[in-house]
């Protein structure tokens, strides 16, 4: 079976010390899993690069799109292989460039040579010079431009053979999924929390989600929107378990017994307590939120301190110092933005106070909570959870 070759490069994995073989093994399995839909696809590490071979009838763009979304992959290049003979390399390079001319209508190029195998007699600059000369001879429409070429042709000579490629298509980088424990994301239907989940997954963390709703004040459509967001994320991280909690009984107790301006913060503290219990039951190491410092009243520095005081588990906030515009750009990049802006309500908009407290005092909030049976409310909420497994 004829197969096309792709060179996959890792990012931070290459910088690991004694643990590098573990990270490489996990990344290899992730790439193999991404390509498992193609019968005959194979991948293996050779001298710090991953060589992927996929049946030639599979479109190049399709293979690349599956590889670049694997966390830990820094870049991917479609490539061709040649024997370690300079004339053979030059012939393959010329053939490669003829195809590039046909598809991209380029006029100028340069060759970058790399001699990773030091036993190869010809040094890197001379590889570039000789291969460039052979390409010029075979491709009359081309000229050399070493400063601003339309195309850079890379020739990498290694122990296993010589490899010729053009583009390095960027991947997300980061660390392979599952190499950094598991976290629980508090998932709303907004823009921020899906981006926060993505960013933690990119750092190698497996993700579960908890979603709070206030049915019947919030609709089934609102929950389906969240499920669609999680399904989009599952395209990057595999099946995601989502825990669904009806927060309405707690909200009604807060509205009935506590000051109006504290409603949002009190609800947030209950969310954190419930999320921590769910995280502990499911062996999650930390909570994750999409909070961004100062964005809304519940995300001021004072409010975050009061919110965090009810849990012992670490709380990760990967967006905390990002501008909203940058968060929105990332949401567009990962495909969640258009879903997030659908105009369906979520539990945070139910019983929203007109003037929420922005600089809360912990002692005052705790006094307000003393009017509530916090332990029972949390226990009932956790016991009423529904679990939805969302696949890509």
What are the functions of these language-model segments?
Residues 1-184, 194-240, 309, 357-362, ...:
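RNA-binding accessory domains that recognize and position tRNA/RNA substrates
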Residues 130-135, 168-180, 251-334, 377-389:
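Active-site adenylate/phosphate-handling loop in enzymes that bind or generate adenylated species
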Residues 145, 243-245, 316:
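General small-molecule cofactor/ligand-binding pocket signal
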Residues 167, 210-212, 245-248, 289-290, ...:
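Generic beta-strand/beta-sheet core signal
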Residues 190:
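Conserved G/P- and acidic residue-centered "switch" motifs that form tight phosphate/ATP-binding loops
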Residues 230-256, 346:
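A conserved beta-strand->alpha-helix junction
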Residues 295, 343-351:
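Small/polar glycine-rich anion-binding or flexible loop at a beta-alpha turn
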Residues 335-343:
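A short alpha-helix-loop-beta-strand transition element characteristic
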């Amino acid at each position: 079976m004829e197969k096309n070759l792709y060179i996959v490069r890792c990012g931070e994995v290459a910088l690991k010390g004694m643990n590098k073989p573990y990270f490489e093994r996990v990344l290899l399995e992730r790439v193999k899993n991404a390509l498992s839909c193609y019968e005959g696809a194979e991948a293996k590490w050779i001298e710090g690069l991953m060589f992927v071979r996929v049946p030639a009838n599979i479109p190049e763009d399709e293979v690349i799109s599956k590889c670049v979304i694997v966390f830990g992959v820094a870049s991917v290049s479609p490539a061709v292989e040649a024997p370690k003979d300079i004339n053979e390399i030059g012939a393959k390079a010329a053939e490669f460039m003829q195809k590039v001319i046909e598809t991209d209508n380029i006029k100028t190029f340069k060759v970058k040579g790399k001699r990773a195998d030091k036993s190869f007699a010809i040094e890197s600059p001379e590889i570039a010079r000789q291969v460039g000369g052979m390409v010029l001879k075979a491709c009359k429409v081309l000229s050399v431009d070493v400063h601003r070429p339309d195309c850079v042709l890379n020739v990498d000579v290694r122990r296993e053979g010589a490899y010729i490629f053009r583009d390095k298509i960027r991947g997300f980088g980061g660390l392979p999924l599952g190499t950094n424990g598991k976290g629980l994301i508090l998932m709303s239907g907004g823009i921020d929390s899906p981006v926060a989940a993505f960013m933690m997954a990119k750092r190698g963390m497996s993700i579960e989600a908890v979603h709070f709703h206030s049915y019947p004040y919030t609709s089934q459509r609102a929950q389906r929107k969240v499920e669609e967001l999680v399904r989009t994320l599952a395209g990057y991280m595999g099946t995601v378990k989502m825990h669904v909690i009806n927060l309405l009984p707690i909200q009604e107790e807060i509205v009935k017994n506590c000051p109006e301006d504290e409603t949002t913060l009190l609800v947030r503290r209950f969310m954190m307590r419930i999320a921590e219990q769910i995280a502990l039951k499911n062996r999650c190491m930390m909570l994750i939120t999409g909070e961004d410092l100062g964005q809304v009243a519940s995300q001021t520095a004072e409010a975050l301190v009061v919110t965090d005081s009810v849990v012992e588990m670490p709380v990760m906030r990967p967006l905390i110092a990002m501008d909203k515009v940058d968060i929105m750009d990332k949401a567009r990049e990962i495909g969640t933005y258009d879903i997030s802006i659908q105009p369906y309500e979520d539990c945070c908009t139910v019983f929203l106070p007109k003037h929420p407290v922005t600089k809360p005092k912990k002692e005052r909030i705790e006094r307000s909570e003393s009017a509530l049976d916090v332990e029972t409310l949390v226990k009932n909420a956790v016991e009423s959870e529904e679990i939805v497994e969302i696949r890509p």
